[in-house]
Amino acid sequence: MKGDKIVIQHLNKILGNELIAINQYFLHARMYEDWGLEKLGKHEYHESIDEMKHADKLIKRILFLEGLPNLQELGKLLIGEHTKEMLECDLKLEQAGLPDLKAAIAYCESVGDYASRELLEDILESEEDHIDWLETQLDLIDKIGLENYLQSQMDE
């Protein structure tokens, strides 16, 4: 099915954001695990896999619309050097992607591509949930202190 060129451009933009997130979250997961923060590492690993699932759905949709998925233009990863900075980097990445998602959803709606819109709405919901989780973790650090937070993330 021949898709709207601008829809495909939007889908590729979101795909690029997802590819950045996959790599960033995967590296952060391994860093957390290396530091003995098993709970945080496991959660971050699952976030990376979740982003990979989003990327997979986007690739399938782009191909269905007879477009070419762009996996070559990767943006910059935001890698923190300590736990709080890593959480802040992840939050910044998620927040930076929201305007792209909302613009893509609005455009898909305007041209009647409801399947792409629904896919993007599902991704938006997931990203908003992740933002909420990240904000909660940063609030916990502020409330209980970094040392107590780190201790709470050590064992499963």
From Swiss-Prot:
Does the keyword field hold NAD?
no
Cofactors required:
heme b
Task: Enumerate the UniProt keywords alphabetically.
Answer: Heme, Ion transport, Iron, Iron storage, Iron transport, Metal-binding, Oxidoreductase, Transport
Q: What class of enzyme is it?
A: oxidoreductase
InterPro entries found in the cross-reference section? Bacterioferritin (IPR002024), Ferritin-like (IPR012347), Ferritin-like_diiron (IPR009040), Ferritin-like_SF (IPR009078), Ferritin_DPS_dom (IPR008331)
- The protein's role, per its UniProt record: Iron-storage protein, whose ferroxidase center binds Fe(2+), oxidizes it using dioxygen to Fe(3+), and participates in the subsequent Fe(3+) oxide mineral core formation within the central cavity of the BFR protein shell.
What protein name does the entry list? Bacterioferritin
Instruction: Supply the source organism for this entry.
Output: Azotobacter vinelandii
Q: What is the lineage of its organism?
A: Bacteria, Pseudomonadati, Pseudomonadota, Gammaproteobacteria, Pseudomonadales
Q: Which gene is this protein's source?
A: bfr
